[in-house]
Amino acid sequence: PVAISGTHGKTTTTSMLSHIALAADLDPTISVGGILKAIEGNIRVGGPDLFITEACEYTNSFLHFFPKIGIILNVDADHLDFFKDLDDIRNSFHLFAKLLPENGTLVINGDIDKIEEITSDLSCRVITFGKEASLNYSAANITYNEQGNASFDVVKDGQNVAHLALAVGGEHNVYNALAAIAVADILGVPAETIQTGLASFHGTDRRFEYKGEVGGVTIIDDYAHHPTEIAATLKSAAHYPHKKLWCIFQPHTYTRTKALFSEFAEALAHADHVILADIYAARETDTLGISSTQLADAVKEHGCDATYLPSFAAIEEFVTTHCQPGDLLITMGAGDVVTIGEDLLKA
């Protein structure tokens, strides 16, 4: 089995690797945490030789896997209702890496802070990818087309081995792709087939998903609910054609909003205008004294226009009167904020 872990990018990377495996006729069995159009769902039952699955760290659930190849995309502070702190999270990923057998391989982002705490005393082979040219797999000469989709050279152990073009946007997806490329390389998939697979991947539901256009305003929906994801999505949007960038953000859980409050404010300020909906409680009942009004004020301190509105109806009315033709509007969050864009398109 190939188990794909990390705080962010699991669904996208699992989907990218699945597309490559399908293009290579490897008949993969697939389990992905989002709807993947290529398999018309989130599960594909294929042959017994290759199982590609997402592996989530929440409640240490990924420690119940038996992977032969493991990916760690990144390690960030999240799920702090379960983990004590970042050291606790790092230790969890270390335990995940230790699951890999001697003849197994860990593919890990070499840019992870204190990576040695994860990779120490492992019996498996370790392969790195990331921004630094000294890593096993890195990307050079990254360029973006008018849709914000990246093309780049794949550099393996210092040698330029391929030039690839993605059909999804953002720098973060270059590194998600590198992880998928590294595993595909281990599986013996040729570069041309890797390119075919990646070119056929246009994203999963709720990951920078184009919803439509109304009154000249383009509406995108994105699942980002952690500051790192928010910043990555808004930076991706900067490469997308637009006049002003609007972000309607619905914070997800009081615990996360409180723990990462200043990081949220800084990340959201990458937009031109931010509209905050009420916090989506999910499994929580205690508000911890935190509110979207406070977050709006914190975003303003970064010099960004921010507004809190108490209902989806009020938000829909506000953007209808304030957005201009040519603007880009992103609904963002892991709750039900997607319905705002869908309502606007129905209007």
Regions found by a protein language model. Name each.
Residues S31-G34, S123-E146, A165-E171, Q195-A199, ...:
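Beta-strand->loop->alpha-helix junctions that form or flank phosphate-binding loops
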